[in-house]
Amino acid sequence: MTTAFDLVYVRKEEEPILAPPRRHGGITAWLLDNLFSSVTNAILTILGIAFLVWIIPPIVRWAFIDAVWSGENRDACLAPEAGACWAFVKAKFAQFMYGRYPVEERWRVDLTAILLVVGLAPLAIPRAPFKQANILYLIVIFPIVALILLTGGHFRISVRSAVLLIGFGCVATGIIATMAAREAAPAVAGVLAPAAALAAIVAAAAGQFANLGEVSVFGATWPTLDAAAAALALVALVLGAAGILSAPGLAGARTAVSLWVAVSALVFVLSVLAADFGLPPVETPLWGGLLITLVVAIVGIVGSMPLGVVLALGRRSKLPVVRFVSTVFIEFVRGVPLITVLFMASVMLPLFLPPGMSFDKLLRALIGVTLFSGAYMAEVVRGGLQAIPKGQYEAAQAVGLSYWQTMRLIILPQALKIVIPGIVNSFISLFKDTSLVLIIGIFDLLGIVQFNFTDPNWASPKTPATGYVFAGLVFWLFCFGMSRYSIYTERRLDTGHRR
């Protein structure tokens, strides 16, 4: 029988002394753990170091040591031992940034860039206050100010255009007010508003084909029918406001007020764009360089994100028509290259417009880039929506949320957080694809760099390589910045496993 005393073990010799443990800190430990942890890793590390030793010295010598930093023309870069011709970049730097934008008006581009940075910087800092006001500034105020600064404002907006918009708003508000009304008086006001707005629209349309003289109103000379249309539109606004404000149906009244305010705000924006601020007009064909690159990229990014969300929701919709239209649009746009979309928008679209009607070439490019990027963004967002478990939808239904409340408060925040890498990847791809607008004659940064290669004052064997390196560095700075900020945002929002 074995007892506890029999299991006692007493060592009769000393334990051999072990080697000291490997250090867990310092550069030596890091090298051993990461670069020389095995024979294979050691061989790969040595080969990598050899490659860097082989490639880096020539690059440094070409870009810095033997580079030409100053000069008046191509003669400075024709020496056989000369490296990069940075004198060419220095001489053409302003053109690379602004294109052919007038020199005396380039302060407007600088001011626009400053206003953009002022709006983006607080938005990019998580702890910065007044986020809602900042978003309102970037979405509403900044685009209007930037458009006026870059173009000069004073757009030729016909009175008829404003009247048509006012009439549309009055018709919408009047109809909703009538539907929301429960008594006779609001109903009458709701009927009169569309009637007055319809009369204003007819008067404005008739002015296209008749010339009945002019009339002076408040010191301004208007065509007679324009003045009549404006007066009828004013009556329609008053009657529409009376109808929606007196309607006892609260939900309908709120919707009508929202539409009425939105149309009134749109008319105000048109009035601001039509105002003369004393700025000389600058046509978009004079834009170029980094200005065009940033305009196309920012408009494409801002426009493609909401478009992609709408298309993704439409493709997952239970309504057959909505799902079919969204699917056809996404698959059609994804099936053609961006060059084809830009070519169609620039060359083919004007052929289908009525005689005398045309769009600015840059505007057509912006629309094409936005639609193209929106189709790809839709698939990225749809991937995030499919990753949300069904229990999230059921939980939202259990607390009584509607479909749009569920999407806005529960589903979309989680889905967008999941696909942050895919979203930023689409943004980076869009930023690099802006160089394709050169196909339709718009000179972005890369296009203006290539265009200056033909300048006889700077034509040399070193000029093209230097220009491409400069353009590549600019693209890399913006793309790398977006990539790093997306990683920071992804880590900041990664709260799934925190306690």
Where are these regions (language model features)?
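Transmembrane alpha-helices and adjacent helix-loop boundaries
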Residues: 2-499
